[in-house]
Structures are given as structure tokens and as C-alpha cells.
């Protein structure tokens, strides 16, 4: 449809290229309900990857994915959101594992948080959330479109290391399979979905939340596509305060 065909044309990227930059730039894709703003500074005022990486010699590109933030221009007529992190502040609090918040009860915080949880920090954190301007279909066709968007950027940057967070994990997989000649490595923070070859069995994972259940299902691709990922370095990082029981 026309609403889907324009998706790869509308992404946004900002960049900082230091003098005598290292061989490969780093491209950063934000998570769900977020924009590239999340890589600029932390909510409590500390430096983000936007300045930390260039200071260490890395050319750094920060993306706003299509239909989000500064890439919000779309031909889609609907503004549908199925994502908890863009429907309520409590959903954001829980999804980012700051603690537990089930209104009307007050929010509680997880212990040993590195991020300050004072009023102004929380205010800034919530202001980083931004809605979608069109549907983000959880389909293979849409995933490949986002992979094309990454390839369009890679054609301009040259070979690069791709860094993704949460929902953008799938963009990293599709992008790497779309451009194995240009993606030199993938670094992904808590990827929202994983990739498996068609026909390979995986342990069933269940959730009472329909969206989570949907995202727990792996992205299925041909073995030929999957093998492309096995030929590049991949670093997967998970954080703390991950629940070990159903909630």
C-alpha cells in the first residue's frame, strides 16, 4: 500500500564525525516509544553516546526510525499504537524496569538504580517518550522495509557497526541480513525479538500480555538469510532487574 511503500523514505539521522575517526562509524537505533533523543543525554543529565563515542574516536549516527520522532512524516492515515510504553507513564515505568507501578497504587522503584529517581529526572525521562505517527506492523514485509531503510543509510555512511535497543533489535537483524556487505558487527541492548531459521524448533514462551506474547515469537527467515548473521560479530547485552516470574 502507499502507506507502507513510503516507510523507507522517511527516516532521520543526525551525526557527529570526529577528526581522524576510527575505521567504522557506529549507527544507533532507539527502542520502542523512543527517538534518537535517548542517545543524546541521560534523563539525569549525564552524557550520552552522542558525545561519548565521538570523543573516543567513533563517527556516530543517531537514527529516528520511520513514523517516530523527527521521522514522523508518513502517508499512513491511522495513528494506531499498540505499544504499552507509549500509552501510559505506568507502562513506561514498568517496561524500562525502573520499578513496579500499577495505578491507582503509587510507583515503587527497584533498588540500586544507577539513574537518579528524583522528580526532575523522572520528568525528563517521561518527556523522552514519543508516539508513533502510523502503525508499525509486526510483519516480515515491514521488517524488510526497515532493513531497506538501514541499507539506504549504510550506502551513505559506508561499512558500519550497528547498535540497537529493544524494539530496534529486529531492525538490526533485518538490516544486517539486507546488507551483510556493509554491517561489520551488531551490538544490541535487550533486543525485542530474535531471529531463527524456518523450521528450527524453539522452547515455547508464554505471556498473559498479548503484545509481549507476539514479540516473544522469533522472526522466522530462510536458512540462507539466517546464515548471513552467523558470519558477523554479534554482541547481545541484557541489563538488571529482569523479572523471573509472571507478573
Where do the language-model regions lie?
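Active-site glycine-rich loops that stabilize anionic/oxyanionic intermediates
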Residues: 30-35, 39-40
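Short beta-strand element of the alpha/beta-hydrolase
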Residues: 23-31
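The feature captures the conserved acid-bearing segment of alpha/beta-hydrolase catalytic domains
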Residues: 193, 198-247
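A conserved short beta-strand
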Residues: 181-197
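Short, small-residue-biased leader/transition segments that mark boundaries at the very start
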Residues: 3-8
Amino acid at each position: 500500500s502507499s502507506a507502507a511503500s513510503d516507510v523507507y523514505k522517511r527516516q532521520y539521522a543526525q551525526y557527529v564525525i570526529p577528526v581522524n575517526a576510527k575505521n567504522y562509524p557506529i549507527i544507533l537505533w532507539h527502542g520502542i516509544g523512543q527517538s534518537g533523543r535517548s542517545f543524546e543525554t541521560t534523563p539525569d543529565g549525564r552524557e550520552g553516546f552522542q558525545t561519548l563515542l565521538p570523543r573516543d574516536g567513533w563517527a556516530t549516527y543517531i537514527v529516528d526510525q520511520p513514523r517516530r520522532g523527527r521521522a514522523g512524516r508518513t502517508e499512513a492515515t491511522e495513528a494506531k499504537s499498540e505499544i504499552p510504553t507509549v500509552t501510559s507513564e505506568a507502562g513506561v515505568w514498568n517496561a524500562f524496569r525502573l520499578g513496579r507501578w500499577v495505578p491507582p497504587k503509587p510507583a515503587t522503584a527497584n533498588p540500586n538504580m544507577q539513574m537518579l529517581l528524583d522528580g526532575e529526572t523522572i520528568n525528563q525521562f517521561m518527556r523522552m517518550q514519543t508516539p508513533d505517527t502510523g502503525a508499525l506492523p509486526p510483519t516480515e514485509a515491514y521488517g524488510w522495509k526497515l532493513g531497506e531503510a538501514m541499507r539506504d543509510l549504510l550506502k551513505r555512511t559506508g561499512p558500519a557497526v550497528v547498535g540497537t535497543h529493544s524494539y530496534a533489535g529486529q531492525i538490526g537483524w533485518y538490516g544486517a541480513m539486507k546488507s551483510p556487505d556493509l554491517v561489520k558487527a551488531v551490538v544490541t541492548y535487550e533486543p525485542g525479538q530474535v531471529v531463527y531459521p524456518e523450521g528450527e524448533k524453539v522452547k515455547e514462551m508464554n505471556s498473559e500480555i498479548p503484545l509481549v506474547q507476539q514479540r516473544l515469537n522469533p522472526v522466522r527467515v530462510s536458512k540462507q538469510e539466517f546464515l548471513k548473521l552467523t558470519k558477523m560479530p554479534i554482541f547481545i547485552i541484557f541489563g538488571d532487574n529482569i523479572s523471573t516470574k509472571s507478573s
